[in-house]
């Protein structure tokens, strides 16, 4: 019942079954293949690339020895040196402009966040004040209702003691209608 080895050499391990070569035709298929390869061994760590570092230009030299230009007096090789220096300086200036633009946008974004947060707090405070006002009105209405009930109860109790004497006289009357009799 052992698996037969084609090479039949002792001590040689069996080869893994080779996966058929699949060429991705669409980006979605390529992503699916990558995910399948990752999920074959979920214990293995997945490679996550780090964010590339931002390019920084070289600082301009503090002291320039050979100041030259693209004038006719320069030698044939000097023009190329000048051209490279000029290109490097333009790159540095472009970088500084982009950096200042990015900082400006960041500042505007932070200001807008602060402004939005302040507006939200103002709206919340206004609504909170309105809720508190309604709550106070309800409490005052409830207190007024309780006081009016107390006054009515006190009036009823004083009027009920006066009307008790009248009720005794009313009880003495003979009812004109009695249920159950015909």
From Swiss-Prot:
Residues 99-157 form a coiled coil. Its main location: nucleus. It holds the Pfam family DUF1168. GO terms for molecular function: double-stranded RNA binding; protein kinase binding; protein kinase inhibitor activity. GO terms for cellular component: nucleolus; spliceosomal complex. Residues 164-173 have a biased composition (Acidic residues). Residues 1-18, 27-43, 114-124, 144-156 have a biased composition (Basic and acidic residues). GO terms for biological process: mRNA processing; RNA splicing. Residues 125-143 have a biased composition (Basic residues). InterPro entries: Prkrip1 (IPR009548). Residues 1-80, 114-182 are annotated as: Disordered. Keywords: Coiled coil, mRNA processing, mRNA splicing, Nucleus, Spliceosome. Residues 126-138 are annotated as: Required for nuclear localization. Residues 51-143 are annotated as: Required for RNA-binding. The keyword Disulfide bond does not apply. It is found in: Nucleus; Nucleus, Nucleolus. Required for pre-mRNA splicing as component of the spliceosome. Binds double-stranded RNA. Belongs to the PRKRIP1 family. Component of the pre-catalytic and post-catalytic spliceosome complexes. This is PRKR-interacting protein 1 homolog. It comes from Danio rerio. The gene is prkrip1.
């Amino acid at each position: 019942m052992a698996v037969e080895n084609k090479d039949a050499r002792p001590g040689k391990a069996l080869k893994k079954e080779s996966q058929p070569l699949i060429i991705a035709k669409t980006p979605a298929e390529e992503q699916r293949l990558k995910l399948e390869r990752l999920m074959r061994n979920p214990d293995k760590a997945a490679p996550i690339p780090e964010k590339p570092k931002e390019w920084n230009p070289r600082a301009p030299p503090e002291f320039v020895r050979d100041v030259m230009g693209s004038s006719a007096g320069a030698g044939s090789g000097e023009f190329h040196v000048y051209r490279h220096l000029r290109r490097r300086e333009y790159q540095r200036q472009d970088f500084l402009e982009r950096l200042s633009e990015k900082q400006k946008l960041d500042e505007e974004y932070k200001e807008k966040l602060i402004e939005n947060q302040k507006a939200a707090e103002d709206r919340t405070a206004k609504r909170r004040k309105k809720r508190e006002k309604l709550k106070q009105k309800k409490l005052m209405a409830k207190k007024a209702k309780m006081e009016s009930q107390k006054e009515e109860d006190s009036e009823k109790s004083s009027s009920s003691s006066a009307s008790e004497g009248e009720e005794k006289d009313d009880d003495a009357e003979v009812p004109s209608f009695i249920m159950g009799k015909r």
